[in-house]
Amino acid sequence: RGGRHYLLTSGMTGYRPNPSEAAVSDDPLRGYTVLGDLSEGDPSNTTFHSQPTCVIEVNGRFLYLGDRWMPELNEWSYTGDPRPDPATQKKIMEKLKELGLDPVRDREEAMKVAIHMSEACNTSLADYVFLPLEWEGGRPVLRWKSEWRL
């Protein structure tokens, strides 16, 4: 974009995405400058629980595509509904009870457990995140949108 090269990265631990980062370079052979996390409003800093796959340009706009290996534990965090689907909610509550955590009192830790429950993962159900990549002062930014148009 604008003659600059952007790099969107993350890692994985099991099937859980790790924090993501964006970097920029005028010349990729001379290295990149890290810009930090690109997802705004994502407490996990993991591009909304996805791993960057690619960015494509469509009609002058850039679209972020990310793999999401654990959709059953992720989507509910960004829809405004504070609860996952009933089956997932039951699995999470069982795990919290096993760990001696109260979902209200230990909310932050409970969210971490819910997000990181690899044993609830069925990767054949993996899905994707498609979001418009926005720009603020030469910096790529992702914001969760339940619905959007080109």
Residue ranges of model-derived segments:
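Carbohydrate-active catalytic/glycan-binding domains of CAZyme proteins
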Residues: 1-150
